[in-house]
Amino acid sequence: MEKRKDTKTTLAKASDDQNKAWYVINAEGKTLGRLSSEVAKILRGKHKVTFTPHVAMGDGVIVINAEKVRLTGAKRAQKVYHYYTGFISGMREVPFENMIARKPAYVIEHAVKGMLPKTKLGRRQMKSLRVVKGSSYAQYEAIKPIVLDA
């Protein structure tokens, strides 16, 4: 079997990262998983025609109204977040209701982080995510974000 020579794959250069767009997504009434997968897709750059898996070419995302995200079924009462304090018997469990009241940004960041690559590239892409409690994103007006209805 002979290899075809008429098809070419174009790969993006690392310098194409300069023209990063920023998007605003309202989390109010949206399901956590569906919202997170949409955000992860934008952070990775999969929505672009020039997507290259090994280059950080994704755009930035600002998520507003983080405290108004919803879960389906009985997960609102059953979902539990775990963390370790570093001490003996230091495993802690925090129910979703308490976490969304205390740290609403963490809930979305945790979900999106799980959908990105577990590499240096994934950690770099995670830096382009901003999660805001409430509907005001005035501190990000200088970057002229595009409001999405996603």
From Swiss-Prot:
Keywords: Ribonucleoprotein, Ribosomal protein
Single GO cellular component term: cytosolic large ribosomal subunit
Family: Belongs to the universal ribosomal protein uL13 family.
PROSITE patterns referenced in this protein's UniProt entry, alphabetically: RIBOSOMAL_L13 (PS00783)
GO molecular function, one term: mRNA binding
NCBIfam families for this protein: rplM_bact
Subunit architecture: Part of the 50S ribosomal subunit.
Any GO BP annotation: translation
Name of protein: Large ribosomal subunit protein uL13
CDD domains per record: Ribosomal_L13
InterPro entries: Ribosomal_uL13 (IPR005822), Ribosomal_uL13_bac-type (IPR005823), Ribosomal_uL13_CS (IPR023563), Ribosomal_uL13_sf (IPR036899)
Its job: This protein is one of the early assembly proteins of the 50S ribosomal subunit, although it is not seen to bind rRNA by itself. It is important during the early stages of 50S assembly.
